[in-house]
């Protein structure tokens, strides 16, 4: 139990520390309502080249492809969507953890790490979904904020 609390505290602190990284964001960053950050807990570094898929639940209750991306050198993906397309609904972010660990020569337990969340049900918001990965576990957290003016 203490380990999980410490892990979540570490993930949250890494999320805020990583904002200090020398990432140059364009003026369009304020228009980025969904951002993803992925960290490698084993190496203590950003998880580079993690494939990420975003799905939106349809009225027929099926998951429809919404967006895709791959983490950059900072373990981040910006501009997965824009304000106009990112409406109210249920979304799933799927991290391809198997391919990430396999490329590093590690045989992981999980094929994917999924985060399912409801977006914009209380008004327009911006979401940062952060994932801390290891071969046999993962932890996620989210920062939900009002859009930047």
From Swiss-Prot:
Post-translational modification comment from the UniProt entry: Sulfonation of the reactive cysteine Cys-32 enhances the stability of the native conformation of TTR, avoiding misassembly of the protein leading to amyloid formation.
4-carboxyglutamate modifications at: 64
An example Gene Ontology CC term for this record: extracellular space
Summary of the tissues where the protein is detected: Detected in plasma and cerebrospinal fluid (at protein level). Highly expressed in the choroid plexus. Detected in liver.
Disulfide-bonded cysteines: none
UniProt-listed InterPro entries: Thyroxine_BS (IPR023418), Transthyretin/HIU_hydrolase (IPR000895), Transthyretin/HIU_hydrolase_d (IPR023416), Transthyretin/HIU_hydrolase_sf (IPR036817), Transthyretin_CS (IPR023419)
UniProt keyword terms in alphabetical order: Gamma-carboxyglutamic acid, Hormone, Secreted, Signal, Sulfation, Thyroid hormone, Transport
Name listed for the protein in its UniProt record: Transthyretin
Annotated localization: Secreted
Residue positions where Sulfocysteine is found in the record: 32
List of residues binding L-thyroxine: 37, 76, 139
Signal peptide: 1-20
Any single biological process term in GO: negative regulation of glomerular filtration
Biological role stated in the UniProt entry: Thyroid hormone-binding protein. Probably transports thyroxine from the bloodstream to the brain.
Quaternary structure annotation from Swiss-Prot or TrEMBL: Homotetramer. Dimer of dimers. In the homotetramer, subunits assemble around a central channel that can accommodate two ligand molecules. Interacts with RBP4.
Main localization (coarse): secreted
């Amino acid at each position: 139990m203490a380990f999980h609390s410490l892990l979540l505290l570490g993930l949250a602190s890494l999320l805020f520390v990583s904002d200090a990284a020398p990432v140059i964001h364009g003026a369009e960053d304020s228009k980025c309502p969904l951002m993803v950050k992925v960290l490698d807990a084993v190496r203590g570094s950003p998880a580079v080249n993690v494939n990420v898929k975003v799905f939106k639940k349809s009225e027929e209750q099926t998951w429809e492809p919404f967006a895709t991306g791959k983490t950059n050198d900072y373990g981040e993906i910006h501009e997965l969507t824009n304000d106009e397309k990112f409406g109210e609904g249920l979304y799933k972010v799927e991290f391809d953890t198997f391919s990430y660990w396999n490329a590093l020569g590690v045989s992981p337990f999980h094929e994917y790490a999924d985060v399912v969340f409801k977006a914009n049900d209380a008004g327009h918001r911006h979401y940062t979904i952060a994932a801390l990965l290891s071969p046999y576990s993962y932890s996620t957290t989210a920062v939900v904020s009002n859009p930047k003016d």
